[in-house]
UniProtKB/Swiss-Prot annotation:
Annotated Pfam families: DBI_PRT
GO molecular function: nicotinate-nucleotide-dimethylbenzimidazole phosphoribosyltransferase activity
Source species: Saccharolobus islandicus (strain Y.N.15.51 / Yellowstone #2)
Superkingdom to which the source organism belongs: Archaea
Family listed: Belongs to the UPF0284 family.
Name of this protein: UPF0284 protein YN1551_0030
InterPro entries: Nict_dMeBzImd_PRibTrfase, Nict_dMeBzImd_PRibTrfase_arc, Nict_dMeBzImd_PRibTrfase_sf
Segments forming a coiled coil: none
Amino acid sequence: MIKEYYGAETFILNKDFAYILVIGTTDVSLIPGLTIAGATPELTHFTPAADAEYVLLGKCKSINTIPVSPTGIPTPALLTRASLSFINPLKIVVNAGSRILPKIPYIDLQGEPGKDIRKQALSMEKVNNIMENSIKLGEELSNEYELIMIGESIPAGTTTAMATLLALGYDAMDKVSSASPDNPKELKRKVVEEALRNLPTDSLQRLAKVSDPVLLGVAGTSLGFKGKILLAGGTQMTAAAAIINEFDKNKLKDITIGTTKWIVEDKFADMLSLAKQVGVKVLASMLDLSISAYEGIRAYEKGYVKEGVGAGGSAIMALVRGVSNNTLVRKIDELYSELVGSNNLHI
């Protein structure tokens, strides 16, 4: 049910944990054809706030429906909420820099929304804010927890992740995943190559040029936390791990990426080679959604969406605690049917 890579072990996950969801936006998601993490490029800026609202409340306030792809595939926040319903951990939403603010309680890192990485993603002032405040958040969480799980929501985040990995010296071109079964590699490459021109030499300044607020928020929280960490995400979390490694070479021994089988088995990306380069362990949930009663859920098995909002890590946490595949899929279907019935989902 859970595959282990590079020395990852599931036993470390059998303790109380807090779920941290770091949200933000990047104007890269407005580039047509780059992401399907929203029904239109403009709506992608609503996705992180709506994801956070749905995980906490079971409904969205910022928009009148949960985020869907242009073809109606539901957000992975649905999988996350279903998995966490069996565990009920503390859930904390952290705003690293979202264009649309969620209508729920959240911690603000005093960052800013990411701009177009082909010009300049973030100001150094805001980069410093995000890093300093997220490190402090991680330190505070250490007072209560030995384990945290960090998820992310930022449309076009795989593109900024690829730029981040390349800026930090990793062989990442064309190796990141996509929410679409048709990974727009050529467009990503073009955007990233333009972003990487005339990079400064300083690491933090490089990140300000080509990264995004969420990667910095995830990395900072991890750097400040004293216990074990499950980075719940796909190729984006390899970029977060690369940032962590850039500033603390000893930290990755306490960190594991928790993702989905759809990420590690993605033929159009190579998440495992990225993890190996960075030096981070990986766990993958083998959750099988082919038995779902709903086509929108079964679409995950065809390469749609794949990961996000901590879906893989949350499934791992549920499976480790004895929840069966069938039980988890039934819960996902139940939540999905509630959304369809409440008109909180347009399909």
